[in-house]
Amino acid sequence: MAKKVKVLLTALAVSSALMASNAIAAKGTLGKVMKQGFVQCGVSTGLPGFSNPNSKGQWEGIDVEYCQALASAVLGDKSKVKYVPLTAKERFTALQSGEIDVLSRNTTWTLHRDTALGLNFVGVNYYDGQGFMVKKELGLKSATELDGASVCVQSGTTTELNLADYFRTKGMKYTPVVFDTAAQTSKGFDSGRCDALTTDQSGLYALRLNLKDPSSAQVLPEIISKEPLGPVVIQGDDQWFNVAKWTLNAMLNAEEFGVTSANVDKMKDSKDPNIRRLLGLDGPKGKGLGIRDDWGYQIIKQVGNYGESFERTVGKGSPLNIARGVNALWNAGGFMYAPPIR
């Protein structure tokens, strides 16, 4: 009986959240954002390279810069963002309830999340995959040697589900050691509460930076899942979905056409029709999106193109020093590809 009641309460909670999200969508997020004068952006509780406060308390990371790009497009000012730190368990409810306008929090795009929670994924701003980190003193070379291991993992994530799938598929046993936040998971691993830590591979490199002795840990070579990470908005609000989607597309197109924060003003004199449409000089401009004509220019001038953002936050210009890999543009051996602005 208790189990039936629990299932019923869960169903009611999901139903209530979806009703709330429908009401928010009907009112229109774009109008709400323009009226309040800022974008309410859901981020992580702290993951270097993606969303993390620096020593001055200022939020930084590739997910943070997406929110700044969105604010630049809509409000003409990248600083018009209010950041809401959320755990993995809290993130979707915060979006469904209207507490945030966009979720930009290293979130994996899955069928269930895209269809059953009243949400829309804007696109992918980082292609990732789940891996494992262990202490070097264990002498492990492969994840296939983790049979019987204890594994630190964050709750409410695809990581937790993938972990179970991987060990079951390999016929191995493990003991999960579950935490609510990435920081807690990292501390648990660092203090020896588990043999291995699992999360997205980019996250492993980020969390390793915060260990007492980063050189004591190594990331194993196996990638056990596909983790397309990207921003999320409420379902049913097509106008806001379009604005959020084309913000990311503009950053990708800007990199493809060589438009950067440093040369964007000079590029206004370009004869290339692709660049002129990107900067709002010709073409559809902001009419279809319901925002300023120079929205693309504002994104690039204030934040930069996708490549600039990547290198600054997780790439060569960051402590993570992650190679572009599959996150390079399609014409440079990667997956990143944006539809044309025309």
Please annotate each region the language model reported:
Residues 65-68, 72-74, 136-140, 144, ...:
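Extended ligand-binding regions for polar small-molecule ligands
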Residues 8-18:
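Hydrophobic helical h-region of N-terminal Sec-dependent signal peptides
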Residues 40-49, 59-74, 108, 128-184:
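Bilobed "Venus flytrap"/periplasmic-binding protein-like clamshell domains
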Residues 281-342:
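C-terminal functional modules
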Residues 68, 72, 76, 80-145, ...:
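Acidic, polar ligand-binding/catalytic clefts
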Residues 18-25:
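Sec/Tat signal peptide C-region and signal peptidase I cleavage site
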Residues 28, 81-93, 138, 176-191:
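Short helix-initiation/N-cap motifs at beta->coil->alpha
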Residues 25-104, 291, 306, 329, ...:
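Extracytoplasmic small-molecule ligand-binding "clamshell" domains
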